[in-house]
Amino acid sequence: MQLLHISDTHLGKRQYNLESREKDVYDTFTQLIDIAINEHVKAVIHTGDLFDVNNPPNRAKLHAIKELKRLKDHNIPFICIAGDHDSPKRKEEIYPQRILEEFNLIKILQKIDNRVKLENVEVYGISHISNVSVNDLKEQLSKVKPETRKSILMLHQGIRTYLPYQGAWQIELSDLPKGFSLYAVGHLHSRRKDYLDGGALIEIAGSPDIMREEEIEDYQKSKKGATLIDMSGDLPSINYINVNIRDQLVLDINVDKIEQSIESVIQKLKENVKNDKKPILHIELEGTVPIRKDVLMTKLQALRDYVEHYRIYKNNIVSIKEENLKTKLKTTYSSLNDIIADYLKGIGYTDEETKIIIDIINEEDEKKVEELLKKFAGVEDK
């Protein structure tokens, strides 16, 4: 029996406020549904963030309805949990998935005691629980005991092993309940898989499109798409199926030789982009000569015929003066007094005047400070 695992589709997301990027997200979802139909899977499991927000735009809801109807026409159930993006932010709100469930297009699993039986495979799921309710999450996980080894647990949570940053994770691998053969996880946008003791598999499908520039490096290595899961053996096996998405690249432009650098970027775009869609370009500025913003923006317009959108991702320009100062600070000065002395001499103070000023700064005795001030002013007591 084969299942298709997808996650973090973020329908309705309008990256960089571009209509073309919103359409890209819809196109990617259509490709995922095509894969499910073409592979004749038993079901699709979606591990959270079907929508980008809890109140998605009408276009996003309409696209979801159209594509999910295609699945239903092929008798392929769509089993999902909610993620942090599409979960309600107020108690009186509902999951947008509930509207789809009302029309029998999907089955949403909200708590751990919800489950779906697919032939001899049990699918459990728990929708996203935030940091403030992490104890409730751990309690729910501690109570679940699958009735069969061929069982799947769907989660949309930060796991410390994969998101080891303060506030980014809610559970550790040790919090996962025992007895499942597959833990299908959403939330992380890059593909991952790990085997636990006993052969159980943690499988992270990742987002099927590039939602943040931090995902570009991993996309270039592992691509994006869906995970085909074969549950027919004693342990699950997986196979990645990629989708065709708009490329995104991070490239340097050196402002010291900006025309030449832009021409080099254009050449790289021609060589590396094989997609029919123009790419998104994230620019890292390099160089040592500051450039006026209006001049920079005018020069960058040469890229417009080759990219869908470009943006300054990082500004790494460091002027020669700044670089020299940093080098001097690292190699020349042994103390704060040396830095102050160098500055004072640089603006015209004599060695003697510089010494007096530094003595005034360092002196704690008020009477001695008064004497030094008089000496500096040339009005010492006779």
UniProtKB/Swiss-Prot annotation:
GO terms for molecular function: 3'-5' exonuclease activity; DNA end binding; endonuclease activity; manganese ion binding; Y-form DNA binding. Mn(2+) 2 binds at residues 49, 84, 156, 187. Keywords: DNA damage, DNA repair, Endonuclease, Exonuclease, Hydrolase, Manganese, Metal-binding, Nuclease. It is an enzyme of class 3 (hydrolase). Induction: Part of the nurA-rad50-mre11-herA operon, these genes are cotranscribed. Mn(2+) 1 binds at residues 8, 10, 49, 189. CDD domains: MPP_Mre11_N (cd00840). Part of the Rad50/Mre11 complex, which is involved in the early steps of DNA double-strand break (DSB) repair. The complex may facilitate opening of the processed DNA ends to aid in the recruitment of HerA and NurA. Mre11 binds to DSB ends and has both double-stranded 3'-5' exonuclease activity and single-stranded endonuclease activity. Recruited immediately to chromosomal DNA after gamma irradiation, and remains DNA bound in the course of DNA repair. Its EC number is 3.1.-.-. The active site is at 85 (proton donor). Belongs to the MRE11/RAD32 family. One of its GO terms (biological process) is double-strand break repair. It comes from Sulfolobus acidocaldarius (strain ATCC 33909 / DSM 639 / JCM 8929 / NBRC 15157 / NCIMB 11770). Homodimer. Forms a heterotetramer composed of two Mre11 subunits and two Rad50 subunits. Interacts with Rad50 and HerA. Nuclease activity is regulated by Rad50. This is DNA double-strand break repair protein Mre11. Binds 2 manganese ions per subunit. SUPFAM superfamilies: Metallo-dependent phosphatases (SSF56300). Its cofactor is Mn(2+).
